[in-house]
């Protein structure tokens, strides 16, 4: 039916109602309607067709839509045929050009031009500009995306073209001429080795040494780095956060000397890095197997600092303290005293973050507002003299002893681009305005719960009052007397026995009995090493056949049983002094700082320790007073009783 309508439409004269409007359409549509011989011409192929009797031609949108569909199908077919014909001609032309080429260079030239411009003609100016801009842009993208790969290829090519010593010396001169690290000479003894799998650049036998020209900083170093792996990022450098993205150091050994020219130059060991670029940031910082000796020439002492493993996922020079406390792993030792920083392994929050553990004198913190991480810090027992704690103005009355430190630290999330904080800011919190941003740096705090355990303290009466770093007095000398008396009362007996043992070891001849009577004690002591435990413990079998009464009382099954204690160790460890304090510090006050002594947190910790110490001393005085009153009352009552009995007799 559609075919009949199209035939009637085409037989109408041009310009009539419902007839064809353009003559070329007839040539496109008629091959669809009339079966033609493709070998013949289009004009002779179409013969006039007599309209059959009874055939009707209906003009309307249906007929026109059918015509358009037929024209579209035929046009697509012709377009495809034209494309195939052009490709066949191009292929034949390319084969002719390659056939005419005599050598490899001409064939390469033909193939290159054929890929670029589909021909063998000379390049035009526009094409040359296009190729140049494309090559330049591609190289820029390659450098930005693969900076480490690009630089490693450049250095590796330099190693093949020049001597390895020359390349290492050139890299050292580039770093030595940096204005930010003036005074430190870098030396690369071996060549660079690219690590393609790790996407790092590896250097071996790198030396960092202070030059003699700049000795005003008060810090000199001579360090040897066995292996250094570095990855670079141009995107990070363009954002102002430094070119180095990740850095891993393996095997640090050497000496660091702190001169006695200026007292403030002690912090310059870290300040020479932080002051160079406060916005510098490392995405991953790792140190393994580090052993250095820090010489303090002012106090004529040295510290053996060892770092076994250090992994910091993000190190920012303007948030140096908070990022170090947020380290995934930090394990090391100071003068053979272990210290470590790690994430809390239990899922429960510390007591001081709960509602029951909050202190009225400290600012209450909502843990939801900070949304940070919890870190545990621990330092094993170390001598106070090695930390120079007795040389500070705050604890000038301590002469000797050991200290053990443990702390639970809550560090807020200081990432400004954190999506979780943005969502919480948008939703707000109960009891507050949801439009107020509660996660701004002004509302973020670092909360630290510290426990100090002093043992075997020896005190002395100082000539000056204890002072803070700001010069403010903490206690007067009269207020300090009860503190010294309390410490001496707890450790005096232990120190007496220790001095007696030392005197016995130094004697070569046997003392007379009269000398021992002067001490009031027999010259007997148990010699033991410091590594021995305070309590000798013997293992015992658990009570498997426990009675029902024990189960009802929930009595634990003893696995160990204490059988003996040394005679010079008291049951309650009276020679230990435990102080606890809690510090709340705004995170903004810890920015751009390299040590706690520079910040106000050190003074806050000192004041909290003194407050806890004064409470302990006050409680000790109250108990001594009650004991004295009880003893006096009992003595007076007994005397009255004896007098009464005497009068009766």
Swiss-Prot record:
**Is Membrane among this UniProt entry's keywords?**
yes
Q: What is the lineage of its organism?
A: Eukaryota, Fungi, Dikarya, Ascomycota, Saccharomycotina
- Record: transit peptide: 1-14
What are the annotated disulfide bridges? none
Q: Ranges in the Mitochondrial matrix compartment? A: 15-134
Q: Which organism is it from?
A: Candida glabrata (strain ATCC 2001 / BCRC 20586 / JCM 3761 / NBRC 0622 / NRRL Y-65 / CBS 138) (Yeast)
Q: Which GO terms describe its biological process?
A: intracellular monoatomic ion homeostasis; mitochondrion inheritance; mitochondrion organization
The family annotation for this protein states: Belongs to the MDM31/MDM32 family.
What function is annotated for this protein? Involved in the organization of the mitochondrial membranes and the global structure of the mitochondria. Also required for mitochondrial distribution and mobility as well as for the maintenance of mitochondrial DNA nucleoids structures.
Q: Which domain of life is it from?
A: Eukaryota
Main localization category: mitochondrion
Has the keyword Metal-binding been applied to this entry?
no
Report the GO terms under cellular component.
mitochondrial inner membrane
Q: How does it sit in the membrane?
A: Multi-pass membrane protein
Per the record, what ranges lie on the membrane's Mitochondrial intermembrane side?
Answer: 156-628
Protein name listed in UniProt: Mitochondrial distribution and morphology protein 32
Q: Which residues form the signal peptide?
A: none
What are the protein's UniProt keywords? Membrane, Mitochondrion, Mitochondrion inner membrane, Transit peptide, Transmembrane, Transmembrane helix
Q: Give the transmembrane region(s).
A: 135-155, 629-649
User: Which Pfam families does the UniProt record give?
Assistant: MDM31_MDM32
Compartmental location? Mitochondrion inner membrane
């Amino acid at each position: 039916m559609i075919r009949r309508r199209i035939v009637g439409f085409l037989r109408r004269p041009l310009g009539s109602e419902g007839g064809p409007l353009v003559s070329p359409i007839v040539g496109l549509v008629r091959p669809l309607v009339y079966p033609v011989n493709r070998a013949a011409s289009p004009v002779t192929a179409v013969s006039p067709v007599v309209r059959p009797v009874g055939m009707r031609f209906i003009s309307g949108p249906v007929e026109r839509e059918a015509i358009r569909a037929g024209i579209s199908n035929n046009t697509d077919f012709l377009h495809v045929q034209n494309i195939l014909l052009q490709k066949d001609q191009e292929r034949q032309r390319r084969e002719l050009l390659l056939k005419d080429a005599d050598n490899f260079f001409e064939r390469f030239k033909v193939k290159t031009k054929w890929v670029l411009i589909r021909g063998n003609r000379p390049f035009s100016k526009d094409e040359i500009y296009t190729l140049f801009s494309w090559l330049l842009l591609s190289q820029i993208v390659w450098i930005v995306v693969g900076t480490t790969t690009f630089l490693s290829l450049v250095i590796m090519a330099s190693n093949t073209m020049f001597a390895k010593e020359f390349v290492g010396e050139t890299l050292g001169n580039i770093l030595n001429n940096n204005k930010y690290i003036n005074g430190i000479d870098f030396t690369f003894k071996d060549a660079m080795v690219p690590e393609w799998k790790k996407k790092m650049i590896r250097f071996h036998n790198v030396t960092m040494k202070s030059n003699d020209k700049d000795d005003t900083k008060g810090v000199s170093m001579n360090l040897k780095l066995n292996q250094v792996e570095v990855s670079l990022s141009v995107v990070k450098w363009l954002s102002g956060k430094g070119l180095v993205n990740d850095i891993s150091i393996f095997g640090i050994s050497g000496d660091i000397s702190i001169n006695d020219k200026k007292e403030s130059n002690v912090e310059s060991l870290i300040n020479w890095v932080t002051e160079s670029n406060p916005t510098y940031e490392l995405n991953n910082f790792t140190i393994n197997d580090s052993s250095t000796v820090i010489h303090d020439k002012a106090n004529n002492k040295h510290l053996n600092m060892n770092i076994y493993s250090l992994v910091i996922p993000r190190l920012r020079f303007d948030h140096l303290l908070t990022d170090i406390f947020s380290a995934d792993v930090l394990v090391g030792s100071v003068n053979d005293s272990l210290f470590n920083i790690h994430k809390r392994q239990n899922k429960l929050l510390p007591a001081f973050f709960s509602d029951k553990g909050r202190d009225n004198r400290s600012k209450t913190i909502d843990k939801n507002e900070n949304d940070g991480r919890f870190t545990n810090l621990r330092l094993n027992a170390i001598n106070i003299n090695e930390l120079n704690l007795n040389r500070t103005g705050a604890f000038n009355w301590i002469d000797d002893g050991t200290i053990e430190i443990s702390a639970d630290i809550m560090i807020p999330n200081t990432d400004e681009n954190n999506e979780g904080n943005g969502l919480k800011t948008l939703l707000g919190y109960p009891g507050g305005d949801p439009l107020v941003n509660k996660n701004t740096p002004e509302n973020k705090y670092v909360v630290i719960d510290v426990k100090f355990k002093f043992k075997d303290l020896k005190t002395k009466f100082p000539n000056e009052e204890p002072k803070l770093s700001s010069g403010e007095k903490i206690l007067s000398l009269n207020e300090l007397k009860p503190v010294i008396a309390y410490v001496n009362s707890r450790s005096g007996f232990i120190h007496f026995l220790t001095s007696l043992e030392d005197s016995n070891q130094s004697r070569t001849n046997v003392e007379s009995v009269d000398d021992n009577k002067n001490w009031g004690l027999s010259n007997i002591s148990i010699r033991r090493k410091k590594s021995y435990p305070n309590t000798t413990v013997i293992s015992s079998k658990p009570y498997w056949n426990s009675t029902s009464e024990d189960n009802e009382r929930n009595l634990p099954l003893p696995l160990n049983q204490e059988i003996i204690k040394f005679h010079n160790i008291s049951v309650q460890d009276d020679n230990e002094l435990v102080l606890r304090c809690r510090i709340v510090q705004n995170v903004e006050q810890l920015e751009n700082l390299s040590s706690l002594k520079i910040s106000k947190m050190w003074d806050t910790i000192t004041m909290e320790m003194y407050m806890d110490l004064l409470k302990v001393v006050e409680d000790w005085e109250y108990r001594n007073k009650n004991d004295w009153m009880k003893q006096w009352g009992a003595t007076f009552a007994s005397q009255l009783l004896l007098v009464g009995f005497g009068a009766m007799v």
